[in-house]
Protein backbone atom coordinates (compact mmCIF):
# COMPACT_ATOMS: atom_id res chain seq x y z
CA UNK A 1 0.00 0.00 0.00
CA UNK A 2 1.31 3.41 -1.00
CA UNK A 3 -0.35 6.46 0.56
CA UNK A 4 1.26 8.76 -2.00
CA UNK A 5 2.38 12.36 -1.51
CA UNK A 6 0.70 13.77 1.57
CA UNK A 7 -0.02 17.25 2.90
CA UNK A 8 1.05 18.52 6.33
CA UNK A 9 -2.37 17.75 7.81
CA UNK A 10 -4.04 14.38 7.33
CA UNK A 11 -7.39 13.18 8.63
CA UNK A 12 -7.32 9.39 9.01
CA UNK A 13 -10.69 7.68 9.44
CA UNK A 14 -11.51 4.19 10.71
CA UNK A 15 -14.61 3.68 8.54
CA UNK A 16 -16.10 0.97 10.77
CA UNK A 17 -15.80 3.23 13.82
CA UNK A 18 -17.24 6.23 11.99
CA UNK A 19 -20.10 4.11 10.68
CA UNK A 20 -20.92 2.84 14.17
CA UNK A 21 -20.94 6.38 15.58
CA UNK A 22 -23.06 7.78 12.73
CA UNK A 23 -25.65 5.03 13.18
CA UNK A 24 -25.75 5.41 16.99
CA UNK A 25 -26.11 9.18 16.84
CA UNK A 26 -28.64 9.37 14.01
CA UNK A 27 -30.85 6.86 15.80
CA UNK A 28 -30.42 8.72 19.11
CA UNK A 29 -31.33 12.10 17.61
CA UNK A 30 -34.24 10.66 15.62
CA UNK A 31 -35.70 9.37 18.89
CA UNK A 32 -34.95 12.65 20.68
CA UNK A 33 -36.38 14.86 17.91
CA UNK A 34 -39.07 12.81 16.10
CA UNK A 35 -40.42 15.93 14.34
CA UNK A 36 -37.07 16.71 12.67
CA UNK A 37 -36.01 15.13 9.38
CA UNK A 38 -32.70 13.51 10.30
CA UNK A 39 -32.40 11.12 7.37
CA UNK A 40 -29.07 11.83 5.74
CA UNK A 41 -25.76 13.14 7.00
CA UNK A 42 -23.68 15.23 4.59
CA UNK A 43 -20.21 13.64 4.53
CA UNK A 44 -18.49 16.79 3.25
CA UNK A 45 -20.04 18.86 6.05
CA UNK A 46 -18.81 16.24 8.54
CA UNK A 47 -15.28 16.46 7.12
CA UNK A 48 -15.44 20.25 7.37
CA UNK A 49 -16.55 19.95 11.00
CA UNK A 50 -13.58 17.66 11.69
CA UNK A 51 -11.22 20.23 10.15
CA UNK A 52 -12.64 23.22 12.03
CA UNK A 53 -12.99 21.49 15.40
CA UNK A 54 -9.48 20.07 15.25
CA UNK A 55 -8.39 23.70 14.95
CA UNK A 56 -6.52 23.37 11.68
CA UNK A 57 -4.41 26.49 11.18
CA UNK A 58 -5.76 29.01 8.70
CA UNK A 59 -2.62 28.78 6.56
CA UNK A 60 -3.10 25.03 6.10
CA UNK A 61 -5.55 25.01 3.20
CA UNK A 62 -4.57 21.62 1.75
CA UNK A 63 -5.74 18.59 3.69
CA UNK A 64 -5.77 14.87 2.96
CA UNK A 65 -8.63 12.69 4.17
CA UNK A 66 -7.86 8.97 4.17
CA UNK A 67 -10.49 6.29 4.81
CA UNK A 68 -9.35 2.89 6.09
CA UNK A 69 -12.08 0.38 5.23
CA UNK A 70 -12.88 -3.25 4.52
CA UNK A 71 -14.03 -4.15 0.98
CA UNK A 72 -17.01 -5.98 2.44
CA UNK A 73 -18.15 -2.85 4.28
CA UNK A 74 -17.52 0.35 2.33
CA UNK A 75 -20.98 1.90 2.81
CA UNK A 76 -21.56 4.62 5.37
CA UNK A 77 -24.88 4.57 7.21
CA UNK A 78 -27.39 7.20 6.02
CA UNK A 79 -24.64 9.40 4.55
CA UNK A 80 -24.28 11.24 1.26
CA UNK A 81 -22.02 10.38 -0.46
CA UNK A 82 -22.20 7.03 1.22
CA UNK A 83 -19.65 4.70 -0.38
CA UNK A 84 -16.00 5.27 0.55
CA UNK A 85 -14.98 2.86 -2.22
CA UNK A 86 -15.70 5.75 -4.61
CA UNK A 87 -12.65 7.55 -3.23
CA UNK A 88 -10.21 4.79 -4.25
CA UNK A 89 -8.87 6.97 -7.08
CA UNK A 90 -8.92 10.20 -5.08
CA UNK A 91 -11.43 13.00 -5.18
CA UNK A 92 -10.24 16.58 -4.99
CA UNK A 93 -12.74 19.13 -3.76
CA UNK A 94 -13.10 22.49 -2.19
CA UNK A 95 -14.93 22.29 1.12
CA UNK A 96 -15.47 25.93 2.00
CA UNK A 97 -11.99 27.46 2.35
CA UNK A 98 -10.09 24.12 2.27
CA UNK A 99 -8.71 22.07 -0.63
CA UNK A 100 -9.41 18.49 0.36
CA UNK A 101 -8.17 15.31 -1.27
CA UNK A 102 -10.20 12.28 -0.22
CA UNK A 103 -8.86 8.78 -0.77
CA UNK A 104 -9.74 5.34 0.52
CA UNK A 105 -7.64 2.24 1.13
CA UNK A 106 -9.11 -1.19 1.73
CA UNK A 107 -7.82 -3.75 4.20
CA UNK A 108 -6.53 -7.21 3.40
CA UNK A 109 -9.16 -9.94 3.60
CA UNK A 110 -7.94 -11.17 6.99
CA UNK A 111 -7.51 -7.67 8.46
CA UNK A 112 -9.99 -5.79 10.64
CA UNK A 113 -10.68 -2.16 9.85
CA UNK A 114 -9.06 -1.03 13.12
CA UNK A 115 -5.90 -3.05 12.36
CA UNK A 116 -5.78 -1.57 8.84
CA UNK A 117 -6.24 1.91 10.31
CA UNK A 118 -3.32 1.30 12.69
CA UNK A 119 -1.06 0.19 9.83
CA UNK A 120 -1.96 3.33 7.89
CA UNK A 121 -1.33 5.47 10.99
CA UNK A 122 2.16 3.97 11.36
CA UNK A 123 2.82 4.83 7.70
CA UNK A 124 1.74 8.44 8.33
CA UNK A 125 4.05 8.57 11.33
CA UNK A 126 6.99 7.66 9.08
CA UNK A 127 6.08 10.31 6.48
CA UNK A 128 8.30 13.40 6.71
CA UNK A 129 5.69 15.58 4.98
CA UNK A 130 2.99 14.92 7.61
CA UNK A 131 3.07 17.14 10.71
CA UNK A 132 -0.41 16.59 12.08
CA UNK A 133 -2.70 13.56 12.13
CA UNK A 134 -6.37 14.01 12.98
CA UNK A 135 -7.86 10.62 13.77
CA UNK A 136 -11.45 9.43 13.74
CA UNK A 137 -10.98 6.19 15.63
CA UNK A 138 -11.07 4.41 18.95
CA UNK A 139 -9.81 0.86 19.20
CA UNK A 140 -7.67 -1.49 21.23
CA UNK A 141 -5.44 -1.90 18.16
CA UNK A 142 -4.65 1.82 18.18
CA UNK A 143 -4.13 1.90 21.94
CA UNK A 144 -1.78 -1.11 21.68
CA UNK A 145 0.18 0.65 18.94
CA UNK A 146 0.72 3.64 21.26
CA UNK A 147 1.64 1.32 24.13
CA UNK A 148 4.22 -0.70 22.18
CA UNK A 149 5.52 2.17 20.03
CA UNK A 150 5.43 5.33 22.16
CA UNK A 151 7.21 7.25 19.39
CA UNK A 152 3.85 7.26 17.57
CA UNK A 153 2.76 9.93 20.06
CA UNK A 154 5.47 12.31 18.78
CA UNK A 155 3.44 13.76 15.90
CA UNK A 156 0.86 16.46 16.54
CA UNK A 157 -2.20 14.24 17.13
CA UNK A 158 -5.88 14.99 17.52
CA UNK A 159 -8.70 12.50 18.03
CA UNK A 160 -12.45 12.37 17.48
CA UNK A 161 -13.96 9.80 19.84
CA UNK A 162 -16.51 9.41 22.65
CA UNK A 163 -16.04 11.44 25.83
CA UNK A 164 -15.99 8.56 28.31
CA UNK A 165 -16.33 5.19 26.57
CA UNK A 166 -12.86 4.89 25.06
CA UNK A 167 -10.11 2.35 24.48
CA UNK A 168 -7.41 5.03 24.33
CA UNK A 169 -5.36 5.33 27.53
CA UNK A 170 -3.02 8.07 26.31
CA UNK A 171 -3.35 11.86 26.68
CA UNK A 172 -4.35 12.99 23.19
CA UNK A 173 -6.44 16.11 22.60
CA UNK A 174 -9.91 15.11 21.46
CA UNK A 175 -13.42 16.31 20.72
CA UNK A 176 -16.53 14.20 21.17
CA UNK A 177 -17.47 12.74 17.79
CA UNK A 178 -21.17 12.92 18.68
CA UNK A 179 -20.97 16.73 18.50
CA UNK A 180 -19.54 16.59 14.96
CA UNK A 181 -22.30 14.26 13.82
CA UNK A 182 -25.01 16.41 15.42
CA UNK A 183 -23.61 19.53 13.71
CA UNK A 184 -23.51 17.70 10.37
CA UNK A 185 -27.15 16.71 10.78
CA UNK A 186 -28.00 20.40 11.09
CA UNK A 187 -28.81 20.40 14.80
CA UNK A 188 -28.21 23.61 16.73
CA UNK A 189 -25.67 23.67 19.55
CA UNK A 190 -28.44 23.68 22.18
CA UNK A 191 -29.87 20.49 20.67
CA UNK A 192 -26.76 18.39 21.28
What are these regions (language model features)?
Residues 1-105:
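Domain-level signal for Mg2+-assisted phosphodiester chemistry and nucleotide/NA-binding surfaces
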Amino acid sequence: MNLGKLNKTVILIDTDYLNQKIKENIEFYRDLYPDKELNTLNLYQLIYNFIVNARVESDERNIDVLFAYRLSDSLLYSTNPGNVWNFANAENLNIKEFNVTIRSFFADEDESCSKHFTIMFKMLHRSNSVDRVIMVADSKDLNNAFQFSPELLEKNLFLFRDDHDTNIDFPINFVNIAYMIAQSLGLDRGEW
